A protein has these predicted regions:
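Short S/T/G/P-rich N-terminal loop/turn motif that feeds into the first structured element of a domain
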Residues: 1-63, 67-80, 96-111
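Amphipathic, Lys/Arg-enriched alpha-helical "gate/interface" segment within cytosolic domains
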Residues: 78-80, 85, 91
Length: 111
């Protein structure tokens, strides 16, 4: 997501709510919807990524990454989100600020 500086605190709060929901409904073992990994990263957007000395744009970039053990994990995740009370507000920020959304993507490289 590319988020203007004046709404970063709101997006931070939504991500914290999402992370709690993820911990409540997902796991790295078979006890819940099974993930390989989940993480969220955040960074100031650079004017020129090749030269950070050029400064920042004033936007903040967020990346939410979820990788499931089984392909059906994405469907299980979306089904579970249907009963999550905070889903509408989270999906609203994703729709408003998300410039790229990859669902059910294939991991093609890793360490």
């Amino acid at each position: 997501m590319k988020v203007p500086a004046d709404v970063v605190s709101h997006v931070d709060a939504e991500i914290k709510t999402h992370a709690k929901w993820m911990r409540d409904n997902h796991s790295y073992d078979e006890s819940k919807i099974q993930l390989v990994h989940y993480y969220v990263s955040k960074s100031d957007e650079l004017v020129n990524f090749a030269n950070p000395d050029d400064g920042t744009t004033g936007n903040v970039l967020f990346s939410i990454n979820e990788v499931y053990v089984h392909p059906e994990g994405v469907g299980q995740h979306l089904d579970a989100a249907g009963s999550w009370p905070d889903a509408p507000s989270f999906f609203e920020i994703m729709a408003k600020y998300g410039e790229v959304l990859v669902i059910n993507g294939e991991v093609i490289e890793t360490l």
